[in-house]
């Protein structure tokens, strides 16, 4: 008698993806983040669904409805803060997942990698629109500043911005459409995740050595299911510690003031996970140049497969490239710090140097160092 798990048309797909999937025997904890991102997405969709049951997307009542959720709804405060801090956990996992891909050369699976970059854009768009929904000061002014960037597009810019706003400023129409998009995008993300996995399972997973591991595979279950459960426990522990002990740690106090179009907050800044891109945007004095730098700071990830000049896939045995990689990580931390600082000396020049270094490392230094390593190894 054949096993239902292997013959049933629907269960068979799940079996090939999560149970009998042949996985390399040596993948480290850095490979846990895919499943953790899946968990984050599920948490966000579920908490978001319950929040949407009580939220009203109207400028007059949006702020009050969030207050109502926190004060009057059973465990509403828990759902709201799980959703807000869940986004932070989502981005921590995302950045680590992308960093893993860069370090171990996973970008050579370029279909999987490019879908991943599109997913990153989609998650960033969703998070941005979600930040607008509570209709606090930072929600309103963040939406105004970021949507206004589109006016830098030649010829159609101004029309485009007014079209997105649904009027001549960020108002009721903007909030309503942002809520609609914020609701639908996670489901589009879930569909893209399926495509991401489809492409990944065409080739199989990469591993820390970067070598082909076809001759040494082990079943995903029980080995990596158990390993993933450990990651899940650590993620949930961190998230709940954040939610229950300091839920506002990563938020902005300005967002507890209802949106007021007549008073600008002293420092307009996005959530922490956008600060690196915000710093790159601000480091260029020209509006269009800044917008292009902002978009290209993420889009540049798509160039990684083309810029890979090393004869080795992974950085595991490339100490020079490792050095450059960790300088890039330090540079991103610097950009994140600068993004949260006011636009004044010395932060302006530090931001400009960090932005130049970011693009220089990816476009110039890493490929050059890769070629030097090839030469040193007489390849």
UniProtKB/Swiss-Prot annotation:
Membrane topology designation: Multi-pass membrane protein
Keywords: Electron transport, Heme, Iron, Membrane, Metal-binding, Mitochondrion, Mitochondrion inner membrane, Respiratory chain, Transmembrane, Transmembrane helix, Transport, Ubiquinone
Residues annotated as binding a ubiquinone: 201
Subcellular locations according to the entry: Mitochondrion inner membrane
Protein family per UniProt: Belongs to the cytochrome b family.
Assembly description: The cytochrome bc1 complex contains 11 subunits: 3 respiratory subunits (MT-CYB, CYC1 and UQCRFS1), 2 core proteins (UQCRC1 and UQCRC2) and 6 low-molecular weight proteins (UQCRH/QCR6, UQCRB/QCR7, UQCRQ/QCR8, UQCR10/QCR9, UQCR11/QCR10 and a cleavage product of UQCRFS1). This cytochrome bc1 complex then forms a dimer.
UniProt name for this protein: Cytochrome b
Organism for this UniProt entry: Spermophilus fulvus
Gene coding for it: MT-CYB
């Amino acid at each position: 008698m054949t096993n239902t798990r292997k013959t049933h048309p629907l269960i068979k797909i799940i079996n090939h993806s999560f149970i009998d999937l042949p996985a390399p025997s040596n993948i480290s904890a850095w490979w846990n983040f895919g499943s953790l991102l899946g968990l984050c997405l599920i948490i966000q969709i579920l908490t978001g669904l319950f929040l949407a049951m009580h939220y009203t997307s109207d400028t007059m009542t949006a702020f009050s409805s969030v207050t109502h959720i926190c004060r009057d709804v059973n465990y509403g405060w828990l759902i709201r803060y799980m959703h807000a801090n869940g986004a932070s956990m989502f981005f921590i996992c995302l950045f680590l997942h992308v960093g893993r891909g860069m370090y171990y050369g996973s970008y050579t699976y370029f279909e999987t990698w490019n879908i991943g970059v599109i997913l990153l854009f989609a998650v960033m768009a969703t998070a941005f629109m979600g930040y607008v929904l509570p209709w606090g000061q930072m929600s309103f002014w963040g939406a105004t500043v970021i949507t206004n960037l589109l006016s830098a597009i030649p010829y159609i810019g101004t029309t485009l911005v007014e079209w997105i706003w649904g009027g001549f400023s960020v108002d009721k129409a903007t909030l309503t459409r942002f809520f609609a998009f914020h609701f639908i995008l996670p489901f589009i993300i879930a569909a893209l995740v399926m495509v991401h996995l489809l492409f990944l399972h065409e080739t199989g997973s990469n591993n820390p050595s970067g070598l082909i591991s076809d001759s040494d595979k082990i079943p995903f279950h029980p080995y990596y299911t158990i390993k993933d459960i450990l990651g899940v426990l650590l993620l949930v522990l961190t998230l709940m510690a954040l939610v229950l002990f300091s839920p506002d740690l990563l938020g902005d106090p300005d967002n507890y003031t209802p949106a007021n179009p007549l008073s600008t907050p002293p420092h307009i800044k996005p959530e922490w996970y956008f600060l690196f891109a915000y710093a790159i945007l601000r480091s260029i004095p020209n509006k269009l140049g800044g917008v292009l730098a902002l978009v290209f700071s993420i889009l540049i990830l798509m160039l990684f497969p083309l810029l890979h000049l090393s004869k080795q896939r992974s950085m595991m045995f490339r100490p020079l490239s490792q050095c450059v990689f960790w300088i890039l990580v330090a540079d991103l931390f610097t950009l994140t710090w600068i993004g949260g600082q006011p636009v004044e000396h010395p932060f302006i020049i530090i931001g400009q140097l960090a932005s130049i270094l970011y693009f220089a490392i990816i476009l110039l230094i890493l490929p050059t160092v890769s070629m030097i390593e090839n030469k040193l190894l007489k390849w």
